[in-house]
Amino acid sequence: QRQMCIRDSFKEAGITGLLGTGFDPGVTSVFAAYAQKHYFDEIHTIDILDCNGGDHGYPFATNFNPEINLREVSAPGSYWENGHWVEIPPMSIKREYNFDEVGEKDMYLLHHEEIEALAKNIPGVKRIRFFMTFGQSYLTHMKCLENVGLLSTTPITFNGQQIVPIQFLKELLPDPSTLGPRTVGKTNIGCIFTGIKDGKERSIYIYNVCDHQECYREVESQAISYTTGVPAMIGTMMVVNGLWNKPGVYTTDEFDPDPYMEALNKWGLPWKVIENPVLVD
């Protein structure tokens, strides 16, 4: 919301500002625009599913910035329904889903920033939720760290110096950039849409599967970094090449999705569309 407040100044300067062009947010929002353009007259529900089926072999580590990751999963969850936000206790809504090329995983409802934009930009949408998968070992470690105060963002005094517990914890955990050579398995990230097309109910699932070891062989990084970095490059390319040219500040769902979707296939993140997928209750 704070970044959107500078939209007018970008318009006056004739500059295109692009927010959130990783995978989620980023690609998932482009998936929504693509579904709206090609598959639906009305989108009624969106479920964003982020599954990491990878294994790095450590007892506990995070796949991206530990401070951001642990804050995200320890915060209250929320989703958009019937025109307003519904807030829930952290990790209190759990579902199981069988992900293509990964298998069945437990996933939990979290707040995620792309919901804020999609709720405004997808006309008539009734519900938007975001789910992310976590294993039981990860959740047990996280709960223990929370119980002893290491997830706190409140500074404390230690040996005469001010430290933030979660920032201290970040220094103790494995650096996510070192996980590439030891991480095996795949990610599966996508969106399930339901709605109406030509007067009939329709549901589709648009998703990408990415292999950790294939990513490492290509760029010496695991799939979490790959699925974040490639979309950032594509978003930049869209703006630099003039394919996305609209002075102001926008999210990725506010542009024509077609060239971005074509670029995903070209640059290592091919996607699939499945009709009538298993829905999340």
Region spans (language model):
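Short low-complexity, flexible loop/linker segments enriched in glycine and/or proline
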Residues: R7-E12, A33-A35, C144-L145
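C-terminal catalytic/substrate-binding lobe primarily of soluble NAD(P)-dependent oxidoreductases
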Residues: H38-D281
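Short, conserved acidic/polar surface loops in the N-terminal third of protein domains
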Residues: R7, S29-F31, Y58-P59
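Rossmann-fold dehydrogenase core element
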Residues: R7-G22, E42-I43
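Short, small-residue-biased leader/transition segments that mark boundaries at the very start
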Residues: R2-I6
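Short alpha-helices
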Residues: T21-F31, Q36, P231-G235
